[in-house]
């Protein structure tokens, strides 16, 4: 995994970094209803897996925003070239395990690869993620049983800096189908403008999925 250290002497958000890093709860989060009308039609027409299709769009969108690829290590910031997703996979006993996926490939290849990795993850059946391997992850989850307007996520102490992205049950409003998508980020790295950029990128990925 390629990465670089940011120069803290020239980092333009140094004051913001220091301030938000000092807080006991340094996170900023929001939930936005994302239009998936056309995407859902494509999923149904091509018999695509809903979760993995959305996960691919989310992964591509997040990686388009540099701040979503940045992590705090000690008192410094590293920026990864590409971040993988770590998502929950439902198990037959009602629990779940974690599965790591790399979205840096064409969508047609990703769907085959991701389905295979999910089956392998079920056999491993673990939620352990330790050491440096966790830094380059985007934490992904879903709540497919309910539509919601806000979401509170569990976070560690001390705070980590991995973005958490979750979506719920899609619903119809008028002639559009909407999906609630939540984002939680460390405010020392990510401001509202960067979160807005993620949602714009997500709209773009949804519009153009499969055109790579």
Which residue stretches match the model-derived regions?
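Gly/Ser/Thr-rich phosphate-binding loops and adjoining beta-strand/alpha-helix segments
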Residues: 3-6, 21-53, 69-83, 137-140, ...
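Hydrophobic/aromatic-rich structural module bridging two neighboring secondary-structure elements via a short loop
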Residues: 63-100
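Charged, conformationally dynamic linker/hinge segments
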Residues: 174-176, 203-212
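Histidine-centered acyl-transfer/condensation active-site motif
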Residues: 132-145, 163-200
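Short amphipathic alpha-helices and their capping loops
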Residues: 1-22, 84-90, 153
């Amino acid at each position: 995994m390629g990465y670089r250290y940011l120069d803290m002497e020239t980092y333009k958000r140094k004051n913001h970094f220091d301030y938000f890093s000092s807080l006991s709860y340094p996170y900023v989060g929001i939930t936005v209803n994302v239009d998936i009308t056309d995407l859902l039609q494509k999923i149904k027409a091509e018999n695509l897996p809903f979760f993995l299709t959305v996960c691919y769009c989310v992964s591509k969108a997040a990686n388009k925003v540099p701040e979503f690829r940045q992590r705090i290590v000690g008192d410094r910031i590293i920026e990864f070239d590409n971040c993988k997703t770590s998502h929950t996979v439902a198990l037959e006993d009602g629990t779940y395990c974690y599965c790591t996926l790399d979205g840096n490939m064409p969508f047609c290849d990703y769907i085959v690869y991701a389905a295979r990795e999910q089956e392998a993850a079920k056999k491993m059946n673990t939620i352990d993620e330790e050491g440096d391997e966790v830094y380059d992850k985007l934490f992904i989850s879903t709540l497919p049983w309910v539509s919601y307007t806000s979401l509170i996520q569990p976070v560690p102490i001390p705070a980590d800096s991995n973005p958490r992205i979750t979506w719920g049950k899609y619903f119809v409003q008028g002639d559009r189908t909407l999906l609630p998508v939540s984002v939680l980020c460390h405010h020392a790295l990510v401001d509202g403008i960067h979160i807005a950029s993620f949602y714009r990128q997500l709209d773009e990925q949804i519009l153009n999925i499969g055109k790579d």
